[in-house]
Amino acid sequence: MITESREHLASKPLNSESIIRLDTPDDKPSLECESIPSGGHISDVSGGPVSTEVKDVNDVSEFEKCAMEEQTHDEVPISASKITVVVAGLVLAVFCMSLDSTILATAIPKIVSQFHSQNEMGWYVSAYSLTLASFSLAFGKIYTFYPAKIVFLITLSLFEAGSLICGAAPNSLALIIGRAIAGIGGTGMYLGSLLLVAEILPFDKVPIITALLAAMYGIAAVVGPLLGGAFADYATWRWCFYINLPMGGLTFLFVFFFVKTGNDRKRAREANNIVSRFLELDPIGVALLIPTLICLLLALEWGGATYSWHSWRLIVLYVVGGCCALGFVGVQIWRQDTATLPPRLLKNRNIWGTILFTFCLNGSFVVLAYYLPIWFQSIKGVSAIQSGIMNLPLILVMVICSLLCSTLVTKLGYYTPFLYLAPIIASTGAGLLSTMHVNSGSSVWIGFQALFGIGLGCGLSLSIVAAQTALPPQDIPTGTAIVAFTQTLAAAVFNFVAQNVFQNQVLSGLAQAAPGVSAAKLTKAGPTMLREIVPADTLPAVLEVYNTAITRAFYVAVGSAALAIFGAIPLQWLSVKNKKIQAVTAHA
């Protein structure tokens, strides 16, 4: 190895793309991977200072901490054709995972009819969503220490196994167990897709593919109920799960044969034995985190709807969840850098800003994605399938705008301007949607949906890019997991808030406008049955009540979208083009 002279080094600027390494005569590095303060000095092996001004265009100390670590995609090049095949497989995987969240919406009645399981049907959805949310941070820890390719293939196999169990389920219990297994695999599969993209692609190309993966959520939200209804009516509901098998199989083959990542997250391998490796995964923290999240999500789902907020079941959830949460926080403070949720990451303004931004913007999307179809079904009197079609302006515009903005980020390098625009446009679109009334025409709901979709497209997928850009390579899995977890948590929390606003408004509105109509009966029947249950003479008044209740729920989306700006403001202006950390050395 040829090392540069001290005189030359002293005059050479150091930045995040050019990290200089001083070597001792025995070819051992004298400058280890350490944090170098901006404008500071480094010393050579003899102790004499080498006056080298650090000029980091991004002023991000995390990059400097691991200057000696190369990005995976620079270590193991992969051809463009293989990248295309792998990305196609990852898109299929994320689509399957997203589809499983929505496809049962129209198929559940057939399942309940076959298994005679009216009291258990809520678990067909909850078993999947609970495990999907509860294991996301745990997989972030696993991906930190073990190869992304291997972990991804294992979680994909789990998802496929869960889907197979669901499809072949002989009874309701087997279906619920299969859904839980699929949820565990799904969350690891989604996180692995994001990480594999960051590993096999140059980082300035990552935003486009991340946007494509994020678009699968929106597409699945529309396609899922249509497919579920078609399978249930014309084939069998079991195909709602069997459909995952061929698509997942293709993804497995593509990743297995074409991804050869050189980054094996070596820290776990440094441990001397299996016990040490296991302890590196923060098992105590994970064991406390999972019941914390399950208790929280169950409380949000059951509270006020299934059970009273003062029932003993909810009280048990409060106590157990609270105790586990306190224990988890204590373990994270104790373990620090080896924690599932390292405290130092939460002190990084790019991370807590991204968390706030993601939580608020994703929350607004969830509210409108859920309540817009209800508005179409109840106010316009259309079927569930027709309401999905009428929801297309929002989804299509969001996908197109997301891909367009990600392309611009690839060209310009900076994502921050789009994160500023997203809350402004999205809150405006949501605000206009909240002004809709019973007689609003198609030009109104199409235009307002499109405006809201533009706002979502500007920022929804770029939040993951923001976290990955701001972190050094070894922290990217944890940072990505935090954002993915925030997306799931936002869905649960904002659905709960909007549901309470909607239900309270319906109850108070019906008591005044149509006291003879049973709110409980309407809620149980669903929005598509509104015109069959309500007498013709009171229908106009009930429609006004429903319109008011739904648009009040839209207020939640307006407020959450507007609050997202407070997450965008703290973010540094970092360029994805500078996300490349290499040691500058010469080889003889």
From Swiss-Prot:
MF-aspect GO terms: transmembrane transporter activity
Spell out where the chain crosses the membrane: 85-105, 120-140, 150-170, 181-201, 208-228, 239-259, 284-304, 314-334, 355-375, 389-409, 418-438, 444-464, 478-498, 554-574
Highest taxon of the source? Answer: Eukaryota
GO-annotated cellular components: plasma membrane
Q: What is its main location?
A: membrane
Q: Where is this region: Disordered?
A: 1-28
InterPro entries attached to this UniProt entry: MFS (IPR011701), MFS_dom (IPR020846), MFS_trans_sf (IPR036259)
Protein family per UniProt: Belongs to the major facilitator superfamily. TCR/Tet family.
What is this protein's function per UniProt? MFS-type transporter; part of the gene cluster A that mediates the biosynthesis of the fungal meroterpenoid acetoxydehydroaustin.
Please identify the protein, giving its name as recorded.
MFS-type transporter ausY
> Native species of this protein?
Penicillium brasilianum
**Gene from which this protein is expressed:** ausY
